[in-house]
């Protein structure tokens, strides 16, 4: 099993599943909700989706072997008229590129030159986590699929606390009730409010 991969499910399948999860979340955004605040401070739902579209494009570009940018995707760079259609187009490109992808090919990443399977871990987890944010921004709490949840948790637990909490990354961990679900526990650990009334 490769680093941060869930048992029995490779990074390519993770990427496909996370992309599908994001598309499903975006397709459910009401037309009048796009400019409402998201659950992430300073971002509208439109900003959140645009940022995550950039992460989706990074996943596809890494698999295709193209040139990737080494900074977080800025919302203004990825806004478009039909975000769901753009994501579906990226998903189709991913499906075309995955069968021939060499997961051991070297790709650039924030950690330097690493195998493709490792370079994909951060942007794929970004898709999964922000899919949850899209739902949360509409007042809904959803559960991440168990395999993606385990994938994200393993990755995040491997990051030193000072790096995880640096500005622009994740907020301080928040308390959760005893009956909190596994997804709620992870999101609260990342500084997300998981109170259904919050």
Predicted ranges, named:
Residues 51-54, 126:
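Short, residue-level hotspots on alpha-helical faces of the histone-fold
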């Amino acid at each position: 099993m490769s680093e941060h991969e869930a048992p029995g499910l490779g990074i390519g399948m993770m990427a496909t599943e996370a992309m599908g999860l994001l598309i499903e979340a975006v397709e459910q955004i009401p037309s009048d909700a796009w400019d409402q605040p998201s659950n992430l401070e300073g971002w509208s739902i439109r900003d959140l989706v645009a940022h995550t579209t950039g992460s989706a494009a990074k996943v596809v570009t890494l698999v295709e072997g193209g040139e990737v940018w080494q900074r977080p995707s800025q919302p203004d760079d990825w806004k478009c008229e039909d975000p769901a259609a753009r994501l579906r187009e990226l998903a189709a490109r991913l499906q075309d590129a995955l069968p021939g992808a060499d997961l051991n090919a070297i790709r650039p990443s924030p950690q330097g030159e690493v195998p493709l399977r490792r370079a994909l871990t951060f942007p794929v987890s970004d898709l999964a986590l922000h899919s949850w944010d899209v739902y949360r921004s509409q007042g809904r709490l959803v559960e991440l699929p168990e395999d993606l949840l385990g994938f994200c948790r393993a990755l995040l637990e491997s990051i030193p606390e000072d790096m995880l909490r640096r500005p622009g990354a994740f907020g301080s961990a928040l308390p959760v009730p005893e009956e909190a679900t596994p997804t709620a526990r992870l999101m609260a650990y990342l500084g997300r409010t998981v109170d259904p009334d919050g």
